[in-house]
Amino acid sequence: MIENYNDIAITDTRRKILNIIDKTLIAMDPENAIKNFIEKNNIKFDSKRIFLIGFGKAAFKMYSGIRPFILKDLVYASIIVPDDEKTNDYNELRILRGTHPFTGDLSVSSSISMLSGLKNLNENDLVIVLISGGGSSLFEIPEDGINIDDIKNISKTMMDKGCDIYELNMVRSMLSKVKGGKLATMLYPARVISFIISDVKNDDLSIIASGPLTRIDYRIEDLMETIKKYLGNDERIKMYRNIDDIYFNNVKQYIILKNRDFLDYIYSNINDDAVNLGSNFSGNVEDLSLILHNILKNIYSSKRKPFYFMLGGETTVDVKGHGSGGRNQELVLRFMKNSSNSEVYTIASFGTDGIDGVSPAAGGIVDSDHEIDNINEYLNRNDSYNLLIKNHGAIITGRTGNNVSDIIIGLYYNK
């Protein structure tokens, strides 16, 4: 899974951490996750007409896992995946492409095309919806009076200013015909079962892919505050329209894989004294790197011996430069920058989708034995990838076909 393993596995501790990352990505594969979930929960697909749609970075692998359970009664299947993702072919499956991390015309045309196969649905039909990270940009149809460039530019402006996923998706649902529960109105009166891989804090169904099947009750005050914070007085954004309960009565949603599952698997396989710090970390990478230092120092002052640690979540970066990098690579460099001579550590941070920001890497790994020069210079232009790749620190996996946000794993102690 890690393509440049030999280049970056330059210490025993690095090898151990990289081996665990590799093993975890394989074990947490979406194809296995959905198979195991269906069998464990004895889920039955009792309909003579089954329709399937899916969107997200894990859509193809999720389809591969559910396929044996539904193929006999399947009348239509179509998914939207990133435009650069490699997939195999199934005769019955229509694979469409979209753009990520910013939506675009390709995502819109694919979304319209995918939904065109869901005609004349009735209460005896079953629609299966496969949702995973990246779905917000891959699955999109703008509201009336909004065009795709509006959505793209608003999203980019908010992301560049360091918004979190909750704020971004709150605004996205205002601009879209399919987000914020609006997809549920299109699938009514059919029964709907959705299988979801969560890439957000607290596994909030209203946030994953901007909640296409979930009623979202935003407080007007929160929405207006978010719009003003990042966009000023932008009159393109309409108020959320209320959706009647009847459209959600036949919708069942199951989260089959989440960040916490990754952390639990890592914890069970570390085979050493370890601390699982949980999966709800968020905020700016600059702040989180300092917070993490303080947490680890406090743990060490209690343990008085080396320990492995792991945590998950999703951070943000204030983009000011035009370099190649991402939040995970910036985090490990900032951790190194803020460390003292008494601290001994190895730390890796990676995106489980295999893509970190605007770079070819999934994330980065650094340690206290291998000093890196000119960190500030590269951070100032958001060019973490080019610094790490020449210092044996960029983790390259390619697209994994998964996405449960980010994972941080490391070893820490003080001299």
From Swiss-Prot:
Temperature dependence as stated in the record: Optimum temperature is 60 degrees Celsius. It does not lose activity upon incubation at 60 degrees Celsius for 2 h. The half time at 70 degrees Celsius is about 5 minutes.
An example molecular function term from Gene Ontology annotations: glycerate kinase activity
Function in brief: Catalyzes the ATP-dependent phosphorylation of D-glycerate to 2-phosphoglycerate. It can also partially utilize GTP, CTP or UTP as phosphate donor.
Protein name: Glycerate 2-kinase
Reaction(s) catalysed (UniProt annotation): (R)-glycerate + ATP = (2R)-2-phosphoglycerate + ADP + H(+)
GO CC term, one of those recorded: cytoplasm
pH-activity note: Optimum pH is 7.3 and 50% of activity at pH 5.6 and at pH 8.6.
Alphabetic keyword roster: ATP-binding, Kinase, Nucleotide-binding, Transferase
Family per record: Belongs to the glycerate kinase type-1 family.
A Pfam family per the record: MOFRL
EC number(s) from the headed UniProt entry: 2.7.1.165
Quaternary assembly: Homodimer.
Annotated residues for binding of substrate: K57
PANTHER family recorded: GLYCERATE KINASE
Cofactor detail note: Magnesium. It could be replaced to some extent by nickel, manganese or cobalt.
Cofactor (UniProt): Mg(2+); Ni(2+); Mn(2+); Co(2+)
Source species, domain of life: Archaea
Organism for this UniProt entry: Picrophilus torridus (strain ATCC 700027 / DSM 9790 / JCM 10055 / NBRC 100828 / KAW 2/3)
